[in-house]
A protein has these predicted regions:
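Active-site neighborhood of HAD-like aspartate-dependent phosphohydrolases
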Residues: 1-50
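A short acidic, helix-capping loop that chelates divalent metal ions and anchors anionic groups
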Residues: 20, 25, 57-62, 95-100, ...
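Alpha-helix N-cap and loop-to-helix initiation/capping positions
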Residues: 26-30, 63-70, 104-105
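Substrate-recognition element of Asp-dependent hydrolases with the DxDx(T/V) motif
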Residues: 35, 39-72, 85-98, 137
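Short secondary-structure boundary segments
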Residues: 54-55, 148-151, 172
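Structural recognition of alpha->loop->beta junctions
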Residues: 72-91, 157-180
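Conserved Lys-Pro-Asp/Glu-containing loop-to-beta segment of HAD-superfamily phosphomonoesterases
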Residues: 101-134
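Acidic, Mg2+-coordinating phosphoryl-transfer loop and its flanking beta/alpha structural elements
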Residues: 126-167
Length: 181
């Protein structure tokens, strides 16, 4: 399966970190134990990572934007400390009842990133734990991986035939092991 990618897009909650619901403070944010090891394996396929995350907790008043910024700073520090190339973190505050095309499954955050970093989206991979992560990847011609951590187990049977993920794995680590073979 080993292939080089321009970039690997990552969902945040349920993909690289434990998702207890809305994470409103830095002390509530916990990477999965396997996240760094998995990302270290994936960097053999690219060392360009971008996190794309819906963060409607801001619109709902459940998290302050300044607390989200602290969480993002921590994520950048951890990626840097582990020599993982995190290019950027894109997030959308939109409430699901009033979404713009930036909110996943909209594609705008991916398009913004591809323009800023000159990425060929057809040579990128999206990894997430919901159908809302996979759908924009399919629309944009990207490869996609559903991880069953987080919400993945709930979503794995909810795909139309043409929108199915290219890969389904129990978690990011098992997906990384298979992809680098």
């Amino acid at each position: 399966m080993s292939k080089k990618y321009d970039c690997i897009f990552l969902d945040r909650d349920g993909t690289i970190n434990i998702d207890p619901g809305y994470i409103s403070k830095l002390q509530d944010f916990k990477f999965f134990d396997f996240a760094v090891a998995a990302l270290d394996m994936l960097k053999t396929l690219t060392n360009n990572f971008i996190i794309i995350s819906n963060q409607s907790g801001v619109a709902r008043g459940l998290i302050l934007e300044q607390d989200l910024i602290k969480i993002n700073e921590y994520i950048f520090e951890e990626f840097s400390k582990n020599n993982l190339g995190l290019l950027d973190i894109y997030y959308c505050f939109d409430h699901p009842d009033n979404p713009s095309s930036r909110r996943k499954p909209g594609v705008d955050m991916f398009v913004e990133a591809s323009e800023k970093y000159r990425l060929d989206l057809s040579n990128c991979l999206m990894i997430g734990d919901t159908k809302w992560d996979i759908l924009p990847a399919k629309i944009l011609g990207m490869e996609s991986m559903l991880v069953l951590s987080g919400e993945g187990e709930k979503h794995k049977n909810s795909f139309e035939e043409q929108g199915k993920p290219d890969y389904i794995f129990k978690n990011l680590l098992l997906g990384a092991i298979e992809l680098i073979k």
